[in-house]
A protein has these predicted regions:
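Signature of long, low-cysteine stretches enriched in small and polar/charged residues
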Residues: 134-209
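Positively charged n-region of N-terminal signal peptides that target proteins for export
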Residues: 1-4, 8
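A short acidic-to-branched-hydrophobic micro-motif
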Residues: 101-131
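N-terminal targeting sequences that direct proteins away from the cytosol to non-cytosolic compartments
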Residues: 6, 18-105, 221-248
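Second-shell loop/turn segments in exported
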Residues: 116-124, 150, 223-230
Length: 248
């Protein structure tokens, strides 16, 4: 636009220029004046409109509906969710809030979902932020125990979310991290039989959805040992995402 305005200003200055005025009068006396014909005025070229940036398009996670299953509340003092009551049982006095999948609740390793409220997050989730998160994850102590097989930005309920699939092998660094984050305590480890019991757990598969709920980054992580339970966990997390409220 600035270049167009400068060009129009230069043309108006040139239109006011003339040859020697005395010579013009002489020529006008010798030559009859010709009829004045206005020169056609050229319309300034229009500046092409700037291209409109399109919103990025992400693969969609379809929100599930468990027909015939009622939703029940569960909370941990920080947040409350509504979950499919026929399929899950809340873990009592456990932080973060955890739901056990009923069909595996008596198994040695039970499939479950935990929900955590993280920090206030004013930004929209996007690929750049996901890349930054993945890069930061590599610097965490015990990072070698986590293998990330899928890390994508997807769309859930018309909102961008992070979708991840991981495999974790528990080692001492992971146990230390779980203690630091309040997931485990030394007392819990001792009651279970010591660290070796945890390190003997087979590689743990997980699928996670990170989304923004009421301005906070909220993490839904499903843990499973049998691939047959994976889709059930994903479907449940879509329901939890739409039915989460914060208590503090």
């Amino acid at each position: 636009m600035k270049k167009v305005l400068a060009l129009l200003l230069a043309l108006s200055m040139l239109a006011g220029c003339s040859s020697n005025p005395a010579e013009d009068e002489k020529n006008n006396a010798e030559i009859p004046s010709a009829p004045q014909v206005s020169a056609p005025v050229e319309k300034p070229a229009e500046t092409p409109a700037a291209p409109v940036e399109e919103e990025p398009s992400y693969p969609v996670i379809e929100a599930a509906a468990f027909d015939g299953t009622s939703l029940a509340p569960a909370e941990d003092g920080t947040l409350r969710v509504a979950y499919p009551a026929d399929l899950y049982t809340p873990a009592p006095d456990f932080s973060p809030l955890t739901l056990w999948l009923n069909e595996t609740i008596d198994a040695e390793q039970s499939a479950n979902i935990n929900i955590q409220k993280s920090e206030a997050f004013p930004e929209t989730l996007n690929q750049e932020l996901l890349d930054e998160m993945l890069a930061a994850q590599k610097t965490v102590e015990g990072a070698e125990a986590l293998t990330i097989n899928v890390a994508e930005v997807r769309e859930l309920n018309s909102e961008p979310v992070f979708y991840l699939e991981n495999v974790t092998q528990i080692n001492d660094a992971v146990i230390d991290l779980m203690i630091a984050e309040g997931v485990l305590t030394e007392e819990m480890i001792e009651q279970a039989g010591g660290r070796e019991v945890f390190k003997a757990i087979p590689p743990t598969k997980s699928v996670a959805i990170y989304g923004i709920v009421d301005g906070y980054l909220t993490m839904y992580t499903g843990t499973y040992y049998d691939d047959a339970h994976k889709q059930t966990l994903i479907d449940t997390m879509t329901i939890l995402f739409a039915n989460t409220e914060f208590l503090s």
